[in-house]
Amino acid sequence: MTYVLLADAKRWVGRSDTDDDAEFTAALNGAERAIDRHCGQRFELDVSATARLFRVTDSCEADLGAQAAVIGNTAGMVVATDDDDDGTAETVWAAGDYYTLPLSGVGPDGRTGWPVNRLVAVGRSFPVGTRRPALQVTARWGWAATPEPVLLAERMLFAAWYQRRATMTGAGGFEGWFASAIRDDQAVTDLLAPYRTGTAIAGMA
């Protein structure tokens, strides 16, 4: 499922028929992939919790977001460390051993609903200087809800594509077109700017 529902996108361009639904869906998929690549992250939530490993360079803080990992649901989250560098995260941290950032889920844009992107150690220290990734976090990764600015950016990209679709042939190349559209539309670029991570695709300014 795309971030923007097909019915919502069609309302934006004044369409209510189903004649071009397949093409519209392909375009929305292309816009979504271009947004994900531009931002270096995806804006949906994993169905179930999975474990991920991280290298940590600061004994007090683990920057998950810098490694394209954010947590949209902390229910059942497990933090564990490999303290002896044997490849097994045998030390499970208690809830009081760390806290999460951003505080209260408030992001740099002042909006709530941002996912966890950093862990701050309180009762313990993160192992650093290890040969193996020393931090293991089990959680549901991603965003609990797609941010409204991202939804607006996708709607705007779809509307821009719709205006030009008569001059485009075939259903391929959507992602490349949308990548260029993001670069060329300052309003879209500004909407997505707060959501770019350090893993955003190089060259997608």
What does each model-identified segment do?
Residues 1-205:
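Divalent metal-cofactor coordination and adjacent catalytic microenvironments
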